[in-house]
């Protein structure tokens, strides 16, 4: 009588070995990300970071040493998009005193920054006459976020929406429904979040998209007076 023996593709020993390798790879990946985060947090200013311009050329933020920077994640199809007008006015008013606005399109919020850099740049210059530097699209949250934004968020956590405005109330209710403790999370919540950088490259303030532009201007004026 012939006996037929069925053998599992992997013995238990080999299966455990494969599982262990997968676990170690995942652990090493997490450790690598953690070390990167620690390295980013150790920075004392924004000048160690580099970004890409619209032609994917590297731009070092140390090129802006001595300037007051307003770093903004933007979108062209957002309810806050008209803020471009106020940003351009702010830039024209204070650029001779040392203000530079750095515009970073981001498509992470409702896919409201579609298209290529050329599409976005043409929209902004054509509709709002923007003349401040605009950079390549990037991510501000998540595993693929820009190291610059990892640093910015660590230095200035979420400040809260303006609950005196209808849009501020709406956004607060929206995020609170998803996570009651959302305000403790430093992540970028929406388009047109602004970070204010002083002349030494330190992140000194954060303005949520619902912040009054008069408050943003006041912050810029104060930063320009700082030595």
Predicted regions and their residues:
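Glycine-biased, low-complexity coil/linker segments
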Residues: 12-13
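Sec-dependent signal peptide recognition
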Residues: 25-33
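Hydrophobic h-region of N-terminal signal peptides that target proteins for export
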Residues: 33-41
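N-terminal "domain-start" segment that seeds a small globular fold
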Residues: 41-62
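Conserved helix-turn-beta segment immediately C-terminal to the redox Cys motif
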Residues: 67-68, 76-77, 81-105, 124-128
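Thiol-based oxidoreductase modules, predominantly thioredoxin-like and allied folds used
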Residues: 98-115, 131-142
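Thiol/selenol-based redox catalytic cores and closely related redox-interacting motifs
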Residues: 129-209
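Non-catalytic, surface beta->alpha helical segment in thiol-disulfide oxidoreductase systems
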Residues: 205-226
């Amino acid at each position: 009588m012939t006996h037929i023996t069925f053998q599992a593709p992997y013995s238990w020993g080999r299966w455990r070995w494969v599982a262990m390798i997968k676990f170690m790879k995942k652990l090493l990946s997490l450790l690598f990300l953690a070390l990167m985060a620690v390295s980013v947090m150790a920075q004392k200013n924004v000048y160690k970071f580099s970004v890409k311009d619209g032609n994917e050329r590297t731009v070092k933020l140390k090129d802006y040493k001595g300037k007051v920077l307003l770093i903004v994640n933007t979108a062209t199809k957002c309810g806050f998009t008209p803020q471009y007008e106020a940003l351009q006015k702010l830039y024209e008013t204070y650029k001779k005193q040392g203000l530079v606005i750095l515009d970073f399109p981001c498509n992470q919020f409702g896919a409201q920054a579609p298209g290529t850099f050329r599409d976005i740049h043409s929209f902004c210059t054509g509709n709002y006459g923007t003349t401040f530097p605009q950079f390549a699209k990037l991510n501000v949250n998540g595993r693929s976020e820009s190291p610059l934004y990892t640093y910015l968020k660590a230095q200035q956590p979420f400040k809260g929406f303006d609950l005196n405005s209808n849009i501020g109330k709406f956004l607060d209710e929206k995020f609170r429904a998803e996570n009651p403790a959302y305000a403790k999370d430093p992540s970028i919540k929406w388009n047109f979040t602004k970070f204010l950088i002083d002349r030494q490259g330190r992140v000194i303030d954060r303005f949520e998209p619902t912040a009054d532009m008069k408050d943003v201007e006041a912050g810029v004026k104060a930063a320009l007076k700082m030595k």
